[in-house]
Amino acid sequence: YHYSDSQTELTPYPMKESINPDGTISPFMIHAKYAAGDIDGVPYSSKGLAPANGCQATQARNPVSYTGMITYMHKLGGHYCGTTSWDLFYRQLMMIIKYATTHSQSIMAGCTSYSNQNQNLVEETGVMRVVLTKAQAAGYVIGSYVSIGDVGSNTNKDRYYSYMHNKAYSVKVTKIEDVDDSNAAVYVDAPEAFDTTLTTWITTMPWHSGATDEVAGSDGSLNSNTNGKDPYKIQGIETCIGAYEVLGNVVMDIVTGPDGNPARDVYVCEDASTLSSNIATVRANYKKAIAQVAYTAASWKYI
């Protein structure tokens, strides 16, 4: 596998993931099929797992950050890493080659517009459901995943907090049924029944791995490619599952830019066994990108 930015280039560059640690070229390259899930404190790319994440639900609390993933991924071995820049580039390259666009959402939107949070309307005991208005319930996708929690007097509904998950964490929506002329119930496959109050909330969560396994072929989403609620796969790799994906081999260093504002230098690690959270080590041993991320006030900084 090679790529080139010129039609006349005679010596194409090998894809980085095809280069072995000793510098030789492998006859194949491997990309993880799924986002990592956690099994007994160890990350695995396996079917049927909630994506590893750092929310404070008892079932989660995984160290998913650039720094945290160094130790977390190395539990599998010194050359393991979270998603790399080359994993991401491969997906982008496949979109360019197969669909002739860099605007991936025009072809497959992924789970990018599915962030519902609704308050339960009816107190119940020993159930596996919440009751919402019919319009609210219609916004949920059967087969997708949600958490249910009693927030009490808390007003912050961020999924990070444990109280957003204290009734049921990342459980599947099994059915949606009308309960009267105005309301409908969203049922879940919680491990045990729970009580609901008027401070119980339901919130969407990322899809579990394997959500695209029933999609015929190598590309596409199960229900809709463009509804913004379904993850998709490209070249067999599942992606856009409804969560931020942290790159495990790239770090941004905050520096003073040419205009005096805080710009970002981008450093890329090309050997997972040398990953470091020490910025001096990063500057000395990582490869510095030519491009610098310019300052933008009060906004996310993207590479």
Language model features by range: what are they?
Residues 6-240:
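Short aromatic-cysteine micro-motif
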Residues 79-88, 213-303:
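Short, conserved beta-strand/loop elements in beta-sheet-dominated catalytic cores
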